[in-house]
Amino acid sequence: MVSKQSKQAGRLPKRKEEFTYRGLTIAEMKKLDMNQVAALLPARQRRKIKREFGEEHQKLLNAVKAGETKIKTHLRDMIILPEMVGVTFEIHNGKEWKAVETTPEMVGHYLGEFALTRHSVSHGSAGIGATRGSKYVPLK
């Protein structure tokens, strides 16, 4: 038998916990300066930030701070920082632009991780035209 409490508990909406990165919410991380944010990131990202971003990286950060919501970029090596959360980036994967909306879970990752340059190919049955290597398969 199912009690009334369990029926009511099943109807209650799930409470979504606020995302935290190393114990800090995104709002708290946005208040920190660049060196304090870098201290929270893994070593490779921390090193890149401490050695300063290049001119193109600074332009991208300025565009984000200016309030642009959709930004096209080739900078696949840009680290996603807390102030970039909520911005939609169109990242070039070598062939086309992939639209990626940044979420709090993406902080500390590179933009290029979310616009893959390769994809797996699923071929049809073997035979003429299936792949380049199977062009010369003798017909039965």
Curated annotation (Swiss-Prot):
<dbReference type="GO" id="GO:0006412">
    <property type="term" value="P:translation"/>
</dbReference>
<dbReference type="InterPro" id="IPR023575">
    <property type="entry name" value="Ribosomal_uS19_SF"/>
</dbReference>
<keyword id="KW-0689">Ribosomal protein</keyword>
<comment type="function">
    <text>Protein S19 forms a complex with S13 that binds strongly to the 16S ribosomal RNA.</text>
</comment>
<dbReference type="Pfam" id="PF00203">
    <property type="entry name" value="Ribosomal_S19"/>
</dbReference>
<keyword id="KW-0687">Ribonucleoprotein</keyword>
<dbReference type="InterPro" id="IPR002222">
    <property type="entry name" value="Ribosomal_uS19"/>
</dbReference>
<keyword id="KW-0699">rRNA-binding</keyword>
<dbReference type="GO" id="GO:0000028">
    <property type="term" value="P:ribosomal small subunit assembly"/>
</dbReference>
<protein>
    <recommendedName>
        <fullName>Small ribosomal subunit protein uS19</fullName>
    </recommendedName>
</protein>
<keyword id="KW-0694">RNA-binding</keyword>
<dbReference type="GO" id="GO:0019843">
    <property type="term" value="F:rRNA binding"/>
</dbReference>
<dbReference type="GO" id="GO:0003735">
    <property type="term" value="F:structural constituent of ribosome"/>
</dbReference>
<comment type="similarity">
    <text>Belongs to the universal ribosomal protein uS19 family.</text>
</comment>
<dbReference type="GO" id="GO:0022627">
    <property type="term" value="C:cytosolic small ribosomal subunit"/>
</dbReference>
<dbReference type="InterPro" id="IPR005713">
    <property type="entry name" value="Ribosomal_uS19_euk/arc"/>
</dbReference>
